[in-house]
Every structure is written in C-alpha cells, then in structure tokens.
C-alpha cells in the first residue's frame, strides 16, 4: 500500500509540474503577442504627439518659413520654396488640419528680404575720403608742441646727475684709509735689528723658605761654575775654568754678589743668565745652561723659574730658542 501511495504522489506531482510549465509558456507567449500588436499604435501616438508639440512651438515662435513649406499642397508653390527649405524633417510629416491656417503667413518672409538689401547700398564711407584738406592742418600744430617737450626734457636730465656726483664725493675719503693698514707690517722689520739679547733663568726656593748656602755652594761647583769676575760664578768653555765664559750665576738679592765663605749664607734664590751672541753655538750653550739650572734646583730642593719668576714651561723654552735664532740671523 505504501508503495502504491508513493507512486501515485509522484505521478500527481509530475502532472502538476508539467501543467505549471505549460501555463507559464502560454502566458508569456500571449504577452509577447500583445506587445507587438500595441507597438504600431504607440508609435503613431508618439508621432502625433511630437508633431502637435512642434506645431505649438512654431506657432509660439512665429516662424514664417516653416509654415509656408509645410502648408503648400500645390505644385507651383512647392517649386518656388524647395530651394529655401532649411530642414528636411518636415517633408516626411503628413499635413494635418492644424497646418491649413498657415497660408496667410507668407508675407513675413517677403518683408525680410528687402531689409537685407537695404543696408548694402548705404555706404557713407566715401564721404570722409574726400577731405584731404583737413589732414595737413592738424599736422602743423602737432609739430609746435613737440619742440617745447624736447627742450623741457633735457633740463631735468642735467639736474639729476648733479646730486649723483655729490653722492660719490663722500665715498672718496672712505677709500683713502685703505692704504693705511698696509703700512702696519713695517714694524715687523724691527725684529732683525735685535743683534743681542740676554736669556735669564732663576732657581728659587719654595714659597716661604730659603736656600742653604753650603748646599748651594756644593751644587754650583758640581755644575762646573767657578768664582770669578764681579764676585759671581761663571761657566767657562772647559770645566777647569779656561776659555771664554758661556753663562754666569749671580745672587737673586741685590747687589747680586757672593761671599766664597757661604757656610752661614742663605738666599731666596739665584739667577743664571747668558748673553747672546756668545762663543760657540748659542743653542747648545742654552741647553747646557738649562741642565745646570735643573741640577742646582734638584740639589737644593728648589724650582726653575723664567725671567718673570714664573714656573718654566715648554712654551717659554721655545720662546727663548726663537730669540736665540733671531739674534744669530741678525749677526750673520
């Protein structure tokens, strides 16, 4: 029973589906046929509506030429106006009853033709050509104002450069001081004139103390100094005191002399000096002088100072060497 019922349901469903398909196909076919039938009517209605709209517009604008072309049915009138048709679209439109009253409107195109020819003959240009006598008359007064203008123009031109020259005059003294700084390097030539100099060093005790005379005497003798002229010590070319003196040692306290018996002697320091030029090589003598000062300072517990009694520096030593070279070059 279940199988029979299922088979019946399948058959009924298939029949229903086929019926639906046939019904849909038939309805679509019917709609298409009705659309094709209604199209020519719609086209005719649309054409009529367009023609009626064009006629209304033409009536509003009052165009005479279009009305003439569309109203004429006679062959004689058609031949006269065929050449003047501006738009071929009106030939295919059927004449309607509304176009019949356009016949009396043929007068406006005829009235338009005469005004076109009327402006052509009117040429008043020939009359001013016949006036040659008036042209030379204005030329003569034109020459007269030209001459005073030319004469007045150069007057301000000459007056303008005069203040310009005055402006350049104060500029001249500005250029004058320029050669003045050129003369400044002239004093540089004074350096070669130095043909002699004195190199000074000091060996001093520390601040608030003094050098012991006995230690000072031993250190001076070890450095090669010998007591001699002016009651001071001298360093000669040879350690035994023979030969010329290279540099000398004096007391820092005035009058700068020494007493050979210096056991009970004290002093804040001693001064070593060398006169340039001297015997032999001055630079080598300067090195020997510096070594002697350092030896004495180490022995007595003092320090080496420059000529200003300041701590000796490498820059000051180079300055001493430059002075020695300068004096040597001046004495060549």
UniProtKB/Swiss-Prot annotation:
One GO biological-process annotation of the entry reads: division septum assembly
Mapped to this chain, the residue ranges on the Cytoplasmic side of the membrane are 28-332
Q: Which residues cross the membrane?
A: 7-27
Q: Where is the composition biased (Low complexity)?
A: 99-115, 123-150, 160-175
Identify its membrane topology class.
Answer: Single-pass type I membrane protein
Q: State the UniProt keywords alphabetically.
A: Cell cycle, Cell division, Cell inner membrane, Cell membrane, Membrane, Transmembrane, Transmembrane helix
Q: Which domain of life is it from?
A: Bacteria
Q: Where in the cell is it found?
A: Cell inner membrane
The segments annotated as topological domain Periplasmic are: 1-6
Region Disordered, annotated ranges = 42-192
Entries under SMART domains matching the protein: ZipA_C
GO cellular component assignments: cell division site; plasma membrane
Q: Which PANTHER family match?
A: CELL DIVISION PROTEIN ZIPA (PTHR38685:SF1)
- Entry-linked HAMAP family: ZipA
State its role: Essential cell division protein that stabilizes the FtsZ protofilaments by cross-linking them and that serves as a cytoplasmic membrane anchor for the Z ring. Also required for the recruitment to the septal ring of downstream cell division proteins.
Quaternary structure note: Interacts with FtsZ via their C-terminal domains.
Q: Which family does it belong to?
A: Belongs to the ZipA family.
The molecule here is called Cell division protein ZipA
Species of provenance: Escherichia coli O6:K15:H31 (strain 536 / UPEC)
Lineage per the UniProt record: Bacteria, Pseudomonadati, Pseudomonadota, Gammaproteobacteria, Enterobacterales
Gene this protein is translated from: zipA
């Amino acid at each position: 029973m279940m199988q029979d019922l299922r088979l019946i349901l399948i058959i009924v469903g298939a029949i229903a589906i086929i019926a639906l398909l046939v019904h849909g196909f038939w309805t679509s076919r019917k709609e298409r046929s009705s659309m094709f039938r209604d199209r020519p009517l719609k086209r005719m209605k649309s054409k009529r509506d367009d023609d009626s709209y064009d006629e209304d517009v033409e009536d509003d604008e009052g165009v005479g030429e279009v009305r003439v072309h569309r109203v004429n049915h006679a062959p004689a009138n058609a031949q006269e106006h065929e050449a003047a048709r501006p738009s071929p679209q009106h030939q295919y439109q059927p004449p309607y009853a509304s176009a019949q009253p356009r016949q009396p409107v043929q007068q406006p195109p005829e009235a338009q033709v005469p005004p076109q020819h009327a402006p052509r003959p009117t040429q008043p240009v020939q009359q001013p050509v016949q006036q040659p006598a008036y042209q030379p008359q204005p030329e003569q007064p034109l020459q007269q104002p030209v001459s005073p203008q030319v004469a007045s123009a150069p007057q301000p031109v000459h007056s303008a450069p005069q203040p310009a020259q005055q402006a350049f005059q104060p500029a001249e003294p500005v250029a004058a001081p320029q050669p003045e700084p050129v003369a400044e390097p002239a004093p540089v030539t004074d350096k070669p004139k130095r043909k002699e100099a004195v190199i000074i060093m000091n060996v001093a005790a520390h601040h608030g103390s003094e050098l012991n005379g006995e230690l000072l005497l031993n250190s001076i003798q070890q450095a090669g100094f010998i007591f001699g002229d002016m009651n001071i010590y001298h360093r000669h070319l040879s350690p035994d005191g023979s030969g010329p003196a290279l540099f000398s040692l004096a007391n820092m306290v005035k009058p700068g002399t020494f007493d050979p018996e210096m056991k009970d002697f004290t002093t804040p320091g001693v001064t070593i000096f060398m006169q340039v030029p001297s015997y032999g090589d001055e630079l080598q003598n300067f090195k020997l002088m510096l070594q002697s000062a350092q030896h004495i300072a180490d022995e007595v517990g003092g320090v080496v100072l420059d000529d200003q009694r300041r701590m000796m520096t490498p820059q000051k030593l180079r300055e001493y060497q430059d002075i020695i070279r300068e004096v040597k070059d001046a004495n060549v």
